[in-house]
Amino acid sequence: MIEALIFDLDSCLAPAMEIGTEPYGPALEAIEEANLGTLSSNALEEAINDIWSHPFDMVANKHGFSTAMIEAGIREFGKIETPGPLHGYGDLSFLDSFDIPLFLVTSGFRRLQESKVRALGIVDHFLEVVVDAIDEPEARIRKKGIIKGILDIHGFSRDRIIVVGDSQHSEIKVAEELGIRSVQTLRPGVSPAPKATYHIQDLGELPDLLESLDLE
């Protein structure tokens, strides 16, 4: 029997850019000002485009941001909050379908991620909401450490937990490394991850999947 589900947030429960691009303006300007020739204009444009769909730290590492660019980005991104209510994907009502503990583990800037969860109105669905905060590097244990901590604290067996998310480079990878099954949500623009245990188009498929696993 599956004992708990661990969900991702962005591109799993809500589009990462549902808040729009405007709140990101000051952070992107700060990164551009701190560039000072580190990246060519084309390379910088490519990096900025990646920011819309990937975690900032991953983008900074991939594109070779300078220390000044990283510091500018962290400083300004850390100030962003969701400007208003969010709706998420149209299947969030299925979060009511589960009678097992649900956990939410999301990577990003703490203020922004916590404001997204509040704006979606989904806090009460989860036993715990944990932010893998990019802007708190000294305390950061990343998603792998957070998920392992959930298993250890609650005494869950690894074969009775499922991680639900979209990113093959983040939660899907972590699940594989920890020996946990994963369900990849194939939201618009998400490519199937070969290493995900299962794939679904929307959360409405999860209850039947869990029922089939309980019958095994």
Please report, for each region that a protein language model flagged, where it lies by residue:
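An amphipathic alpha-helix signature
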Residues: 21-29, 52-57, 110, 114
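A metal-dependent, Asp-based hydrolase signature
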Residues: 30-33, 44-80
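Alpha-helix C-terminal capping segments
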Residues: 43-48, 60, 92-100, 192-193
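Asp-based, Mg2+/Mn2+-dependent phosphohydrolase catalytic module
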Residues: 1-3, 96, 103, 109, ...
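Short helix-capping segments at alpha-helix termini
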Residues: 30-38, 65, 121-125, 155-156
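Active-site neighborhood of HAD-like aspartate-dependent phosphohydrolases
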Residues: 1-41
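Short, acidic loop-to-helix structural element flanking the phosphoryl-transfer center
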Residues: 78-104, 144
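Short catalytic-loop micro-motif centered on adjacent basic/acidic residues
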Residues: 14, 43, 104-105, 163
